[in-house]
Amino acid sequence: MTPHINAKIGDFYPQCLLCGDPLRVSYIAKKFLQDAKEITNVRNMLGFSGKYKGKGISLMGHGMGIASCTIYVTELIKTYQVKELLRIGTCGAISPKVGLKDIIMAIGASTDSKTNRVRFLNHDLSATPDFELSLRAYQTAKRLGIDLKIGNVFSSDFFYSFETHAFDLMAQYNHLAIEMEAAGLYATAMELSAKALCLCSVSDHLITKEALSPKERVESFDNMITLALEMMS
């Protein structure tokens, strides 16, 4: 048990899917897993373990932003020995290369957060995912006929007050979208010798101002959930 997770040791499987929204974690457990069991609920941040096609897998919410995400990731790795962490979330696109409903694999994560500079003695950390997980995601997407978009994301500490004038510059550097956690997830996994990857479904396009309806968001997210579970099974 940790200050933020009240699961017993052994309740988490070595592979864990992460979502910012705990209700989305509950949704995945009920719709996609067999024998799903709630294993933690501190602060209503839910976690489940169950089976997908006979293989054990866990789910955990992590809240919003790098600070919240890295707390849960650290405790999952250090206390519960989780080895592979796959974040599935939504993002806002900033590049003409991607559109609504596209699934992005973040092969790098820049950030306006200071956390990685603090942990890396004020140097620039290359926050990148695990290659093996990335390869599995790519191969699984090919098998499922999913056109996976591959590029960098920008993990921002800001949801509303963001430097919109920087979008063109980010797109020039092959940043496809804005989200809020990948840079912290990757850095924590690197520090603690775990494997991590972030997949994001495009729910809004920050340049064209397009946005999915609530129904379309669910359908789009279901495709990413299937990809995530298939690559981990």
UniProtKB/Swiss-Prot annotation:
Top enzyme class: transferase
Alphabetized UniProt keyword annotations: Glycosyltransferase, Transferase
EC number(s) given by UniProt: 2.4.2.1
GO cellular component terms listed in the entry, alphabetical order: cytosol
Residue positions of the active site: D204
Keyword Glycosyltransferase: yes
Family note: Belongs to the PNP/UDP phosphorylase family.
Function: Catalyzes the reversible phosphorolytic breakdown of the N-glycosidic bond in the beta-(deoxy)ribonucleoside molecules, with the formation of the corresponding free purine bases and pentose-1-phosphate.
Protein name: Purine nucleoside phosphorylase DeoD-type
